[in-house]
Amino acid sequence: MFEGPVQDLIDELGKLPGIGPKSAQRIAFHLLSVEPPDIDRLTAVLARVRDGVRFCAVCGNVSDDERCRICSDPRRDASVVCVVEEPKDVQAVERTREFRGRYHVLGGALDPLSGVGPDQLRIRELLSRIGERVDDVDITEVIIATDPNTEGEATATYLVRMLRDIPGLTVTRIASGLPMGGDLEFADELTLGRALAGRRAMV
């Protein structure tokens, strides 16, 4: 254990996902070794993220405006919506360059053991979005692209149950080929692109 601010920094860094005690200590001592202007730039960026980044009012993706750049782009097909768990998954799908529709970010996946049920996700917003015809466009297809793990599959099954009786709506699931238990963000562009192109109807 270190004393004072150094230990406080290590403790805070250790709260970040994927950062264990040793990594937190290594990062902390790296930060202690850099020049003060570099620390100032880092803290300024963190402050801008805290104060300026919000979630898109339409899809839930991260944005610096009320609408994200994808929802604001008239070239995107508003009739096709790809449902993902987190904003990082939007970036994973975008890297494939295979999808030209829009997104809906749930903010997680169903996980009853962790207290995450339907009310903790943006499922109600998805249903409202389908019913309200955002930008005067009917949503005709919802692509479910939750992670291929237990929570992601449970979320996909729940969404199918909620969406299958909506007239004129096709519900599809990205094809198999992604490793079971993996995350979309770690899939390579070719594999994820093929999974999107080979999506299958669920209803």
Curated annotation (Swiss-Prot):
It comes from the Bacteria. Keywords: DNA damage, DNA recombination, DNA repair, Metal-binding, Zinc, Zinc-finger. Pfam families: RecR_C, RecR_HhH, RecR_ZnF, Toprim_4. GO terms for biological process: DNA recombination; DNA repair. GO terms for molecular function: DNA binding; zinc ion binding. Residues 79-179 form the Toprim domain. A zinc finger (C4-type) spans 56-71. Belongs to the RecR family. May play a role in DNA repair. It seems to be involved in an RecBC-independent recombinational process of DNA repair. It may act with RecF and RecO. This is Recombination protein RecR.
